[in-house]
């Protein structure tokens, strides 16, 4: 009979090590960054803790999840293989040879990355049979719909590490999920400071700005300010073939003029 083990992978904060020993009975944490390219940052590493050996800690994770951001993992594989995989998927490659760190242990990133509808998920899960976390996307945060999420991987019992391990390459669906995370984070920061009816409305304005050829955060933010000031105005049919700042000026001028025209003929 397969024996399952349960683990907590907790995102780092300054007080985490101390709290672990306050709440844990036998924390004995593994530092995720050890034996990886991030070993130089080991002091700020997420910590992996055996949940069955620390029932009070597991209860705290379930009862007060905002105080313990991280993942709950269930696996039929030994500790060494779980750690091997968790460390392996830390460093990822994008199109070309660009490398990055995948902060999958963050509930925010997990809500985008592991929720992407991709046939590659079993590869990313590897030895993990069940994955749970509390949180959600930036949109969920704005709409007050954060909660617990659980995903399963029926292929975990048959998983074996590759003999010649290569860096994981991000597929298009996962790349889009991470790009959406960045876009929603940018929008949430703007939306939380502005009197917009809904996050969804603000998202539509952001998408309009992108289609208009606005790319930089300053231009997109200025466009959002203009749309917020003139929410009922229509966009011009097409942007002029000029640089970004001229497109932004053309757009904001059109929005202001559209309001004046409506007032004139009302």
Locations of regions flagged by a protein language model:
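Signature for HUH/AEP ssDNA processing cores
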Residues: 50, 54-57, 61-77
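Short, hydrophobic/proline-enriched secondary-structure or compact coil segments at domain edges
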Residues: 1-15
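Short, charge-rich binding segments
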Residues: 62-64, 92-95
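Conserved beta-strand segments of the P-loop GTPase G domain that flank and frequently precede/overlap
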Residues: 8-11, 49-50, 72-75, 103-104
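A contiguous, surface-oriented mixed alpha/beta subdomain in the mid-to-C-terminal portion of proteins
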Residues: 2-4, 19-35, 43, 48-49, ...
